[in-house]
């Protein structure tokens, strides 16, 4: 179908083309075009940069159309497949869906970790640019930056009330930040001999645990900043530390392909979990609500009856996710589907689903009961490094090597 321009539109287009040719140094072409199009040599200011503006707005509109088409296709697919539509789904069944609600830019290097504030509508991101940034996930607005580290910030964690933020860095330090009023660094702890890769508060908030490339895990007293315990046992770089909600145990994972579960109060390793064939990048404790789905999934593989848990998920460079019963040191089942390293894990608060982030640039939503990937989100332009699920609101956030933080609405 041929599009017909009005006389006025044709004149404006000719003027815009003439302006483009002139401002980009195509003098000969401009002269020939002016002659053929019968244009005066007087360029009007209003046509300055008009062609570029129209061109970029067309691209922007095309992108919007593609997003809307993707949404429509997804909605149609759900209706055809008989999946519960939004009206029929309960909040416990809501999962992140494309496109993203916000894409937040500002970091000047890869994003290493993204987390939600436990109470306020805020997101915190850590980056290889040595800064920590705070964002409002309800508006997509940037709030502020926390500066103090001198090398890549590897992990961030809140205490239960969200009053203190802990961060750790390749500069060998752990920092505590006042998140109530001043947003200043209130303590810096030194003691590790290499890159500090992960940090976590114990639930009571009086101690912080840190994991390092020096193969150790250390416990620090928040009030004094002193190191009170060192846990040794991993044979290589300790990648992540995560404390169980009850606080009596915590888990670590490492480049030595293992996961260790430790007793917080002693220095003893309770159990070592071995089944991964490569570095274990990330771990996540399952909420109590996930027990029935995990038991049902495990029952299909082994008839050993009811598993008590606690349950832990682990993601590895071997591209798999494993679900473990920590009480017996047993891998209950494996989730396969990612095409590259698994970098981040987060359980749905209602316990039915697990979301994962990977270097294959996707976020995957796993139906635990059926042990299958039920949705794949093509989330980022580069490796997807971190993911978090809000405990009370229907949002997921992801961070990437593409330097963006994305907010995904669950529905």
From Swiss-Prot:
Q: Quick check: keyword Cell division in the entry?
A: yes
Instruction: State the Gene3D superfamilies in the record.
Output: 1.20.960.30, YVTN repeat-like/Quinoprotein amine dehydrogenase
* Subcellular location(s) per record: Cytoplasm, Cytoskeleton; Cytoplasm, Cytoskeleton, Microtubule organizing center, Centrosome
> Where in this chain does the entry annotate a coiled-coil region?
56-83
Q: What is its main location?
A: cytoplasm
The record's SMART domains line, in alphabetical order, gives:
LisH, WD40
Gene Ontology terms: cellular component:
axon cytoplasm; cell cortex; dendrite; dynactin complex; dynein complex; growth cone; kinetochore; kinetochore microtubule
Disulfide pairs here are none
Named from the GO MF annotations, one term is: dynein complex binding
Q: Which GO terms describe its biological process?
A: border follicle cell migration; centrosome localization; centrosome separation; chorion-containing eggshell pattern formation; clathrin-dependent endocytosis involved in vitellogenesis; dendrite morphogenesis; establishment of mitotic spindle orientation; germarium-derived cystoblast division
LisH domain: residues covered: 9-41
Q: What is known of its domains?
A: Dimerization mediated by the LisH domain may be required to activate dynein.
User: What HAMAP family is this protein classified in?
Assistant: lis1
Descriptive protein name: Lissencephaly-1 homolog
- What species is given as this protein's source? Drosophila ananassae (Fruit fly)
């Amino acid at each position: 179908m041929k599009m017909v321009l009005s006389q006025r539109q044709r004149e404006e287009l000719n003027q815009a083309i003439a302006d483009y040719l002139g401002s980009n140094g195509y003098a000969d072409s401009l002269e020939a075009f002016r002659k053929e199009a019968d244009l005066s040599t007087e360029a009007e200011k209003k046509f300055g940069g008009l062609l570029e503006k129209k061109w970029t707005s067309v691209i922007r509109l095309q992108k919007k159309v593609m997003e809307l088409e993707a949404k429509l296709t997804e909605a149609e697919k759900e209706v055809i497949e008989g999946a519960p539509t939004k009206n029929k789904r309960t909040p416990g069944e809501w999962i992140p869906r494309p496109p993203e609600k916000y894409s937040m830019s500002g970091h000047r290097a890869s994003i290493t970790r993204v987390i939600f504030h436990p109470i306020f509508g805020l997101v915190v991101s850590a980056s290889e640019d040595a800064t920590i940034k705070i964002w409002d996930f309800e508006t997509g607005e940037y709030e502020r930056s926390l500066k103090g580290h001198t090398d890549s910030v590897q992990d961030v964690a809140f205490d239960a009330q969200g009053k203190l933020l802990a961060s750790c860095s390749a500069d060998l330090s752990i920092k505590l930040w006042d998140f109530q009023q001043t947003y200043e660094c209130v303590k810096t702890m030194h003691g590790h001999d290499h890159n500090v890769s992960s940090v976590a508060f114990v639930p009571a908030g009086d101690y912080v645990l840190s994991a390092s490339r020096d193969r150790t895990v250390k416990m620090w007293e928040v009030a004094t900043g002193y190191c009170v315990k060192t846990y040794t046992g991993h044979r290589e770089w300790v990648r992540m530390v995560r404390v169980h909600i009850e606080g009596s145990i915590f888990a670590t994972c490492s480049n030595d392909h293992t996961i260790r579960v430790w007793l917080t109060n002693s220095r003893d390793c309770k159990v070592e979990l071995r089944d991964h064939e490569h570095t274990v990048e990330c771990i996540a404790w399952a909420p109590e609500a996930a027990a029935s789905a995990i038991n049902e999934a495990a029952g299909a593989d082994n008839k050993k009856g009811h598993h008590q848990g606690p349950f832990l998920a682990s993601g590895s460079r071997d591209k798999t996710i494993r679900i473990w019963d920590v009480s017996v040191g047993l891998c209950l089942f494996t989730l396969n589907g990612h095409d590259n390293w698994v970098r981040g894990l987060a359980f749905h608060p209602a316990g039915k689903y697990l979301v994962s982030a990977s270097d294959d640039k996707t976020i995957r939503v796993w139906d635990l009961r059926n042990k299958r990937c039920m949705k794949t989100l093509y989330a980022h332009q580069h490796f997807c490094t971190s993911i978090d699920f809000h405990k009370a609101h229907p949002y997921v956030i992801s961070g990437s090597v593409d330097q963006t933080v994305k907010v995904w609405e669950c529905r």
